[in-house]
Each structure stands twice: as C-alpha cells, then as structure tokens.
C-alpha cells in the first residue's frame, strides 16, 4: 500500500469526520483519479514532439499515456481532424497515491519562486486543477535529455461535494495552499 493511501486511511479520514461531522466513513471525500494532460499544439509541425512528450509523461506518471487527437479541423490553427495534438494519462489506485506523494513532497518544492498553490483553482464540484509550467520539476526527468520545456495540467478528481470539503481533503495531504 502506498504511503499516502495509508496516511489517508489512518489520519485523513478521522480528521475529516471530526471536522465535517460525517455519519459514515463512506461519506468522507476521497480522491478518485488524477489526470495529467499535455497539450502539444506545436506537434503539427514535428511528429518527434509527440514522441518526446509521451516519453516524458511515461516517466512522470509511471504508465503509458494515450495520444489525444483533434476532434475537428481548425483552419486557423492549421490542424485537421485526427491530428495528434496532445497526450494524457489517468492515474487511479496505488499509482495515483504514489504520484500524489511525489508531486507534493518532491516536485512542488522544486518549482522556482514557489509560494504555494492557489486555493481558488477548484471547479465548484470539489475537483482541483493545477498547471505546471515546466516538466523538469519532476525528478524522473533528466534535464540534459529534454528537447523543450513543456507544461502540463494536473486534474485531481475527488468525491467531495463542495470546494471546502475538497480543499480540506487536499490540505490534509499537506498540499501547500497559499491562501
């Protein structure tokens, strides 16, 4: 069992029951999945970009991402339907908890001028989104082997009904909120 998964069962659940007064353990919000998405609009010019991004995401997530394709043609962006324009990977279960552990304890402190993550990036339904500007904050990425700095979106989907519950859940996982 992953360290954060054990921590959730032993410390987070009792703390949230006490704070919000849940009657059942099943009412306590939990993280269902973490989705990592890399949009690669510049990949229309060079197919190697997709391969490099897939390699980076594989190292970061620990599992192979799926290449996302354009749903429809957009002449302004010079893309046709079916063109590969991104890569995404969905983490659940033990892999999700291990990624969350590495993200909070190792990757976030490596961000330059880091003052905490925004407490306002919740979507109103208890899900949290965070953007990472460069993939080199993850220790799995070798700085000398990357071809370009690429950002990625990280979506944390929870069973929380409100943003306050989701924020309390993530804060109990030692998420460094600045406000």
Curated annotation (Swiss-Prot):
GO process terms (BP): translation
Keywords from the UniProt entry: Ribonucleoprotein, Ribosomal protein, RNA-binding, rRNA-binding, tRNA-binding
GO function term, MF aspect, one: structural constituent of ribosome
Gene3D superfamilies, sorted: 3.30.1440.10
InterPro entries registered for this protein in UniProt: Ribosomal_uL5, Ribosomal_uL5_bac-type, Ribosomal_uL5_C, Ribosomal_uL5_CS, Ribosomal_uL5_dom_sf, Ribosomal_uL5_N
GO cellular component labels: ribonucleoprotein complex; ribosome
Function: This is one of the proteins that bind and probably mediate the attachment of the 5S RNA into the large ribosomal subunit, where it forms part of the central protuberance. In the 70S ribosome it contacts protein S13 of the 30S subunit (bridge B1b), connecting the 2 subunits; this bridge is implicated in subunit movement. Contacts the P site tRNA; the 5S rRNA and some of its associated proteins might help stabilize positioning of ribosome-bound tRNAs.
Family (UniProt): Belongs to the universal ribosomal protein uL5 family.
Subunit structure: Part of the 50S ribosomal subunit; part of the 5S rRNA/L5/L18/L25 subcomplex. Contacts the 5S rRNA and the P site tRNA. Forms a bridge to the 30S subunit in the 70S ribosome.
HAMAP family (UniProt xref): Ribosomal_uL5_B
NCBIfam families: PRK00010.1 (NF000585)
Protein's recorded name: Large ribosomal subunit protein uL5
